[in-house]
């Protein structure tokens, strides 16, 4: 179904995985060597609240920032259902060249690995300026899982509105609101994804988002600094203060709507 234009839009959406595949082939472990000293200084200057999150390189608190069944120990059936949902949300055209199982041993995302992958993708032009959508979110998860063996439990961003900061310390890609004119929306060069999946209607705040690389996120945990309430009890805030801040931002009301919808 659909005309010629819809096929063009669909094909452009499927190019993301291909672009990420083309970015492979180099090792970026050397990036950590230049960051290690500065990172240590940043950690020493951090407050107790940030230290309590255990953001040191090579450390990871399982379930800390997850939105998958692994957050709370689940049955194997629940995990399989989650993986199947991810696969169902990604078209078969997106899976061209995608291996059935990870090419390397499965591993969790770490601070160092997030830094390396961020620079790796940036230097190959894989995400800069690309419109964000839930579908592309899953494509990125799928790519890193199949090509790098990284369990897809780490990619979360602050709720908005405005700039959405990564909640996993070390991931250097944030989401920024962009203005898209009516003319640009009709221009074929802007059809990186079907409009139904990139329009402001997909975002609860009515914003169109795009990925943007920010190297300062390697030293400044903006998600925690700007929105500690989104980390719940790990923020060091009282339960009442967390509730107050979430209510002031309209996040609790939004969560209630999702439950009733």
From Swiss-Prot:
GO cellular component, one term: host cell plasma membrane
Keywords: Host cell membrane, Host membrane, Host-virus interaction, Lipoprotein, Membrane, Myristate, Viral immunoevasion, Virulence
Family the UniProt entry places it in: Belongs to the lentivirus primate group Nef protein family.
Keyword field contains Lipoprotein: yes
Source species: Simian immunodeficiency virus (isolate PBj14/BCL-3)
Region spans: Mediates dimerization: 138-154
Domain comment (free text): The N-terminal domain is composed of the N-myristoyl glycine and of a cluster of positively charged amino acids. It is required for inner plasma membrane targeting of Nef.
Predominant location: host cell
Name of this chain's protein: Protein Nef
Membrane topology: Lipid-anchor
